[in-house]
Structure formats: structure tokens, C-alpha cells
């Protein structure tokens, strides 16, 4: 037997040894004193003929411990990656806690949006997004945030940004910096553009919005757009720049109307009642 190989086997056996190990007289192999399974195995006959008889193996309890440790390591890495994805997704939005499960009210619209998240693989493959439109305070941004968190739980990358912030960033950057920022908007699996129409109503602003929407469409990756602009206005837009933007969005985004009372007004009314009670 090769002396170097012998030393390697001896070193492994020494590292694998425990005080309660024992030799099983039935087969002459070393067994674990805890789980009573072999810590050695015989080489195939052709190797035994060359002087190689036994080699170390993991007993059952050591193998199970290694498996647990590996599972814990993988879970730690998964949770760390998920934390990173969430911090990247909500840089400028307080949406990390927005979830379908914790919604105060499950509206029909929220149920539809949840269906989008549940069938994400198919929508992602087809490059289909959502257009969430309706009055102020009806839960459009919350619904989009719920989708984001549901996808991040599946380790999908998401970026949730306000449209006005996008335009401001584009206006403040030039050349390579603007290109770099544009690429950052194209990179995630899902891009959420919040509050279309809140950006500056200028030719520059409209050009930047169109650039983002158009380039995102060309990537084939989905986007979710939220807006207070009625769907009828988007479909009947007279201004050429507006029509170009809306046509591109409607080409790949399924519209869902959010109506009903404003949740913000309801929350404000509840806060006033609480304050009145506490202040006497």
C-alpha cells in the first residue's frame, strides 16, 4: 500500500474516532458507540488484493449531523440573500412589511393581484405585468408592495421606485451615470413603477418615462405600474408623448381598477377618533 495514502487514511480515521467506538466482531469493522452503525467499510476485492482493506465512512449520526449543518448553512445563505433582495427592492419605499397575509381587508382587486404573484412563473415567462389604476388611497401601491414581498420570498429580484424619483434621478445624472441608472432599472426580475403621473409634466419628464417603459418592454421582463390616471384617459390621450407612454404600458400590462373608499381617509378618521378620545 502506498505509505502516503496510508497516512491519509490514518489521519481521517483519527479525526473520525470517538472514545465509545468499538470493533464489531461480526465483520471486524469499527462502529459508532452512539448510533451503532459502521464507521468503516471494506474496499472492493480488487483493491483488497493490492493491500487496501478498509476505509473510513460516516456513521449514521455523523451523516445526519452533517446534513443538518448543510441545511442550516443553505437556509442561512437563503435568508441572507433574501434580506439583501428586500433592502435593494425598497430603497426609497417603506414597503418591506406589506404582505397579502397581513392586509386589513382583502378586496377583489387585491385577490387578483395575489393571483398574479401566485402565477408569477407564467407571467414572468410571458413578460406580462400589471397596471394598477384608480383613485388616491385605494391600495394600489400596497398591492404592488405585496407582490414584491411575495416574489422576494421566492428569491426573485424586485425594484420598487416612484416614477417621480426615477425622472429626478435621470435629470440629475448625465452620460455614463444615466446609463448606469437605466441599467439598474432593467436588471431586476420585476420593476414596479409607482405613481405614474406624479412626475413633472414636462417634455423632458415624458421622454424619460417613455425611455424607461420602452427599454423595460424590450427586455421582455414584467413591470407593474400604479397610477391615479383613469384608464379611459390613458386610452384616449390626445398628447402624443402621453399616448406613446400609455400605449407601451397597455401593450404589456393588464389593467386592474382599484375603486372604493380611500383607505388613507379611513385611517385618518380613525386616528382623529383615537386622538379625540385620548385628549378628552
Where are these regions (language model features)?
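Walker A/P-loop nucleotide-binding motif
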Residues: 124-144
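Short glycine-rich substrate-engagement loop in P-loop NTPases that contacts/grips substrate
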Residues: 108-117, 148-188, 200-203, 207
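Loop/turn-to-beta-strand initiation segments
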Residues: 156-157, 187-190, 219-225
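P-loop NTPase catalytic core of nucleic-acid-dependent motor ATPases
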Residues: 97, 108-129
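Active-site donor-binding loop signature of nucleotide-sugar glycosyltransferases
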Residues: 61, 105, 163, 258-260
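A short, basic N-terminal segment
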Residues: 1-110, 266-280
Amino acid at each position: 500500500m502506498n505509505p502516503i495514502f496510508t497516512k491519509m487514511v490514518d489521519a481521517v480515521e483519527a479525526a473520525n474516532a470517538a472514545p465509545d467506538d468499538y470493533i464489531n466482531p461480526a465483520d471486524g469493522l469499527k462502529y459508532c458507540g452512539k448510533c451503532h452503525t459502521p464507521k468503516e467499510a471494506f474496499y472492493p476485492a480488487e483493491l483488497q488484493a493490492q493491500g487496501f482493506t478498509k476505509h473510513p465512512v460516516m456513521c449514521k449520526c455523523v451523516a445526519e449531523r452533517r446534513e443538518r449543518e448543510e441545511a442550516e448553512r443553505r437556509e442561512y445563505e437563503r435568508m441572507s440573500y433574501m434580506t439583501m433582495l428586500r433592502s435593494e427592492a425598497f430603497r426609497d419605499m417603506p414597503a418591506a412589511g406589506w404582505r397579502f397575509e397581513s392586509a386589513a381587508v382583502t378586496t377583489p382587486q387585491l385577490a387578483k393581484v395575489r393571483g398574479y404573484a401566485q402565477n408569477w412563473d407564467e407571467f414572468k415567462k410571458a413578460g406580462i405585468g400589471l397596471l394598477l389604476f384608480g383613485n388616491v388611497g385605494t391600495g394600489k401601491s400596497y398591492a404592488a408592495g405585496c407582490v414584491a414581498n411575495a416574489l422576494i420570498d421566492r428569491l426573485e429580484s424586485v425594484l420598487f421606485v416612484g416614477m417621480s424619483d426615477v425622472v429626478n434621478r435621470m435629470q440629475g445624472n448625465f452620460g455614463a451615470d444615466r446609463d448606469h441608472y437605466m441599467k439598474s432599472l432593467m436588471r431586476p426580475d420585476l420593476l414596479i413603477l409607482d405613481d405614474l403621473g406624479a412626475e413633472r409634466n414636462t417634455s423632458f419628464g415624458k421622454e424619460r418615462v417613455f425611455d424607461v417603459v420602452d427599454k423595460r418592454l424590450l427586455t421582455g421582463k414584467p413591470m407593474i405600474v400604479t397610477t391615479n390616471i383613469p384608464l379611459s384617459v390613458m386610452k384616449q390621450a390626445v398628447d402624443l408623448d402621453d399616448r406613446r407612454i400609455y400605449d407601451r404600458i397597455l401593450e404589456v400590462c393588464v389593467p386592474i381598477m382599484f375603486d372604493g373608499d380611500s383607505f388613507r381617509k379611513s385611517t385618518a378618521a380613525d386616528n382623529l377618533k383615537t386622538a379625540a378620545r385620548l385628549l378628552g
